[in-house]
């Protein structure tokens, strides 16, 4: 079907173009055209068939502006789509690890940190997972350009900290060790420690300190001793397991109060020993 528009449809599209709308709801259509929701749904359905709108979920559409050409080719950048689904947000965990080259694992799920609660969402071949953070943890991100699109991405230091904070969203403890190994070559150590302390999470500090020591002992990474010392006062009294999902046994590291329940060979499986 051609992208030709009726008078009412033209009014809506011009308004959306003028407002630079990316996401359009049925309520938006009803408000702009001053019509009932049932009428708005019919109009939205027609515009979907004419490739001016692409359905994201019930009553929610991606607007495909005139600049996308006569065929109405929608955007193919899932990072753009994700950025339009929730506010505030920033990409983190496996997604930002891949962006900075801290991980070579390419995962189909895109992880967005937010202070809101949102259900997971699928668009084409991409799965979006929304990770709800407390407000004091929602910091340390910047605007970056990816494939011509500007999105919010965790800073390198916050990427590492977030990954240690929520291991399962970064591929598990073995993958996170590799992330730290690669990240320590690029991040600012002082900022890394400061961000870790700002999270107000003893377990995070304990795991990060333990994993940094593993890399130091293997001789595959370096870390300033004074920054390591800044972490130690924030070690909690309670001992924790390195891998929360692992075996409930292992040797206790007294400095970090971490029970190493992952065999060394398994823990280092994702780290390139040089």
PLM feature spans:
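Short beta-edge/loop segments at beta->alpha junctions of small alpha/beta modules
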Residues: 1-88, 185-205, 213
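Short N-terminal helix-initiation segments at or just after the protein's N-terminus
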Residues: 23-27, 40-42, 98-105, 236-247
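Short gly/ser-rich loop at a beta-strand->alpha-helix junction or flexible surface loop bordering the NTP-binding
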Residues: 26, 45, 49-50, 55-68, ...
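A residue-level signal for conserved active-site and pocket-lining positions in enzyme catalytic cores
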Residues: 29, 96, 160
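Generic structural signal for bulky hydrophobic/aromatic residues embedded
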Residues: 32, 99-100, 163, 211
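Hydrophobic/aromatic-lined pockets within catalytic cores
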Residues: 34, 48, 101, 165-169, ...
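Short amphipathic alpha-helical segments with coiled-coil-like heptad repeat character
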Residues: 37-39, 104-106, 168-172
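Hydrophobic alpha-helical interaction segments
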Residues: 142-274
């Amino acid at each position: 079907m051609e992208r030709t528009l009726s008078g009412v449809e033209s009014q809506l599209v011009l308004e959306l173009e003028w407002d630079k709308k990316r996401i359009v709801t049925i309520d938006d259509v009803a408000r702009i055209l001053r019509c009932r929701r049932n009428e708005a749904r019919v109009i939205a359905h027609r515009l979907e068939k004419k490739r001016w709108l692409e359905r994201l979920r019930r009553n929610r559409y991606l607007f495909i502006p005139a600049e996308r050409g006569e065929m109405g080719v929608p955007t193919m950048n899932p990072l753009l789509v994700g950025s339009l689904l929730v506010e505030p947000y920033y990409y983190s965990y496996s997604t930002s690890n891949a962006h900075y080259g801290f991980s070579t694992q390419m995962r189909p799920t895109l992880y967005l940190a937010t202070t809101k609660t949102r259900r997971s969402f699928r668009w084409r071949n991409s799965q979006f997972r929304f990770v709800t953070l407390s407000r004091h943890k929602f910091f340390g991100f910047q605007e970056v350009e990816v494939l011509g699109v500007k999105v919010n991405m965790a800073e390198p230091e916050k990427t590492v900290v977030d990954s240690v904070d929520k291991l399962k969203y970064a591929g598990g403890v073995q993958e996170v060790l590799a992330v730290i190994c690669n990240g320590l070559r690029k991040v600012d150590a002082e900022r890394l420690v400061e961000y870790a302390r700002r999270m107000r999470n003893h377990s995070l500090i304990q795991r990060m300190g333990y994993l940094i020591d593993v890399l130091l002992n293997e001789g595959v990474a370096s870390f300033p001793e004074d920054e390591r010392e800044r972490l130690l006062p924030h070690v909690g009294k309670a001992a924790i397991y390195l891998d929360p999902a692992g075996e409930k046994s292992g040797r206790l590291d007294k400095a970090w109060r971490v029970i190493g329940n992952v065999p060394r060979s398994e823990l280092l499986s994702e780290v390139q020993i040089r």
